[in-house]
């Protein structure tokens, strides 16, 4: 089974005070144990780093700590899926043809990575936006607190 994690899951898995920490952390630990193929979109790495280093926590998560989390928990075990320039062009064309704009376009990068990796599950706490972008595969989109890992 291939499972793609989005930023919302990775952030929750790193922040013990996050409301969904337990479910996200369980999925991350199972991924690191090799229970399934762990997949992330390349842009998710940068987005997770950006979010972690700007969360209003005390003490703040320092850039070196955010990098260490990604290095140890994600880069060491996950397959990173990167979009090509042609993928970006096709995605922009599709978004323009459907009149889709604004911040949701960043979620479309995640959906495209999920398609390219042929994942079985796209794990997110952002269900509605992703189901809107990938209606043909809405059943693949799930939240860590709604699905038990293998």
Which residues fall in each region the model found?
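Short, well-structured N-terminal submotif of metal-dependent ribonuclease cores
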Residues: 1-40, 55-68, 132, 145-150
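Acidic, PIN/NYN-like endoribonuclease modules and their adjacent C-terminal/linker elements
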Residues: 2, 111-150
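Alpha-helix/helix-capping structural signal
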Residues: 8-9, 43, 109, 128
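Alpha-helix C-capping/helix-to-loop hinge sites
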Residues: 13, 31-34, 51, 55, ...
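Active-site-proximal, substrate-binding regions of enzyme catalytic domains
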Residues: 25, 49-79, 87-89
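Short beta-strand segments at enzyme active-site cores
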Residues: 39-42, 124
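Active-site neighborhoods of divalent-metal-dependent phosphate/nucleic-acid chemistry enzymes
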Residues: 79-127
């Amino acid at each position: 089974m291939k499972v793609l994690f989005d930023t919302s899951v990775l952030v929750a898995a790193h922040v013990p005070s996050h409301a969904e920490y337990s479910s996200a952390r369980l999925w991350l630990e199972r991924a690191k144990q090799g229970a399934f193929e762990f997949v992330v979109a390349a842009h998710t790495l940068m987005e997770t780093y950006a979010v972690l280093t700007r969360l209003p926590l005390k003490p703040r998560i320092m850039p070196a700590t955010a990098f260490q989390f990604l290095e140890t928990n994600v880069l060491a075990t996950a397959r990173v899926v990167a979009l090509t320039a042609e993928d970006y062009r096709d995605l922009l064309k599709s978004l323009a043809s459907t009149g889709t704009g604004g911040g949701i376009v960043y979620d479309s990068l995640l959906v495209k990575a999920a398609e390219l990796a042929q994942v079985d599950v796209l794990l997110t706490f952002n269900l509605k936006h992703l189901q809107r972008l990938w209606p043909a595969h809405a059943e693949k989109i799930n939240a860590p607190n709604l699905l038990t890992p293998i």
